[in-house]
Amino acid sequence: MNTVKTVRELRAAVTHARSAGKRIGFVPTMGNLHSGHATLVTKAAQQADFVVASIFVNPLQFGAGEDLDKYPRTLAADQEKLLQAGCNLLFAPTVEEMYPGGMTGQTRVSVPQLSEGLCGASRPGHFEGVATVVSKLFNMVQPDMAVFGQKDYQQLAVIRAMVHDLNMPIQIIGEPTVRADDGLALSSRNGYLTDEQRAIAPVLYRSLSQIGAAIKAGDHDFAKLRAEQVQQIEAAGLRLDYFEVRQGVHLRPATPEDRDIVILVAAYLGATRLIDNLHLTLD
């Protein structure tokens, strides 16, 4: 696996692979990789002949007071994990390489509606930063397909909409969330949790599983079901950001008629913000 730091080197390597008839897969990350990321790379390697991963901690998607400066940078360990997972090329640019004109005047990509509620409400500008950097990376790599984790469900919905609306010829694959044995969704931010907090954190997935089972059993009183789970999460000591039952594609509030449903939660455990979701396809 080669590591390149400039767009010119990236494009040369991808052009060489494509000229050999290879299908290009892409997995964008912010580094500090765990086995969930490795699953995304493995999926790309199954679907493509040449896999590019990127590591870039994108300042545009961090708001004031968020963890940009303390976000872990673990390049050497990440390179080893990518190699083991089947990555062929790592693109690890600097901020200056990604935003050579600075960020103030940078052209932005905005996906309205899908970006506005849920995480978008408490992290204004976040999804604009995500859409902007992903569109830049897509233009740099020009992959045939890209893999994203379903743990960041709203992000996946935003990227699918952007690719559709801007006619990008890229297949987007959503890969199921990888979980610890106790159900906690793997996340780079789990490393911020104390041992005590880590023991509490699986309450989020328990709540999702309970409300999901109730909905599958035919209970469509979403307000009542939500209130029960909110009470359980707050009783465990988390500070809730949101707990919502939404339609699975457009993320509008779900109705009893919907067959494609996603339940999404975000909550703070101490200073650490955790997110999770459960996607349901009803018969």
From Swiss-Prot:
Reaction it catalyzes: (R)-pantoate + beta-alanine + ATP = (R)-pantothenate + AMP + diphosphate + H(+)
Locations listed in the record: Cytoplasm
Annotated keywords: ATP-binding, Cytoplasm, Ligase, Nucleotide-binding, Pantothenate biosynthesis
GO biological-process terms attached to the record: pantothenate biosynthetic process
Top EC class, one word: ligase
This protein's record includes keyword ATP-binding: yes
EC code: 6.3.2.1
Entry-linked Gene3D superfamilies: HUPs, Pantoate-beta-alanine ligase, C-terminal domain
Domain of life of the organism encoding this protein: Bacteria
Record-annotated active site: H37
Annotated InterPro entries: Cyt_trans-like, Pantoate_ligase, Pantoate_ligase_C, Rossmann-like_a/b/a_fold
Record GO terms (molecular function): ATP binding; pantoate-beta-alanine ligase activity
Binding site for beta-alanine: Q61
CDD domains assigned to the protein according to its UniProt record, in alphabetical order: PanC (cd00560)
Additional information: The reaction proceeds by a bi uni uni bi ping pong mechanism.
Self-association state and partner proteins as the record states: Homodimer.
Purpose: Catalyzes the condensation of pantoate with beta-alanine in an ATP-dependent reaction via a pantoyl-adenylate intermediate.
Family: Belongs to the pantothenate synthetase family.
Name of this chain's protein: Pantothenate synthetase
